[in-house]
From Swiss-Prot:
Family membership noted in the UniProt record: Belongs to the phosphoglycerate mutase family. BPG-dependent PGAM subfamily.
InterPro entries documented for this protein: His_Pase_superF_clade-1, His_PPase_superfam, PG/BPGM_mutase_AS, Phosphogly_mut1
Top-tier EC class: isomerase
Name under which the protein is recorded: 2,3-bisphosphoglycerate-dependent phosphoglycerate mutase
Function statement: Catalyzes the interconversion of 2-phosphoglycerate and 3-phosphoglycerate.
The keyword Isomerase is assigned to this record: yes
Amino acid sequence: MSGTLVLVRHGQSDWNLKNLFTGWKDPDLTELGIQEANAGGAALAEYGIKFDVAYTSALVRAQHTLKLILDKVGQPDLQTIRDQALNERDYGDLSGLNKDDARAKWGEEQVHVWRRSYDVPPPGGESLRDTGARVWPYYLTEILPRVLHGEKVLVAAHGNSLRSLVMVLDKLTKEGVLALNLATGVPMVYKLHADSTVASKEVLGDMSGAH
């Protein structure tokens, strides 16, 4: 068995609360989001893991989540690598719009297709497949080698960037990943074999509140 990979979706952001398409826009966490990140950190502290390195996106809501988690596990000065390859899916022309307003403008069915299809992007934005096309190569070249070296690696990122990873790690179909929702602030602990396949997966919290 090789190293450990922990994935955490950022806590609730201001725009999650306001029901806005966020994407690459950069709101911070709400009070609830801070609580969620702290809860995830407390779960990891209780689990007893100490990390060798952390990765996060170029967006403040993921970076803030990571900082809160690292404080909880007693590693505030851990090496942290930030890269936009781990950013949320880019919603293009939908970014900043209220989801109800978007449905009024383009129709509920069209917005549903943009949100929930695998390979149909919104205007000027990315599909889930597009998101995976930047996340997965970054994982393979930057993150996975450290896990396979036996390190314990923490990744704090976003719903869709993490779904892109989980799709491959959990061997989900396109239909399976579209049905997958990740709760905010809930760590997923993967232990990997030396051949990079998953040896075990443990969820430290409740995924039933995912959205």
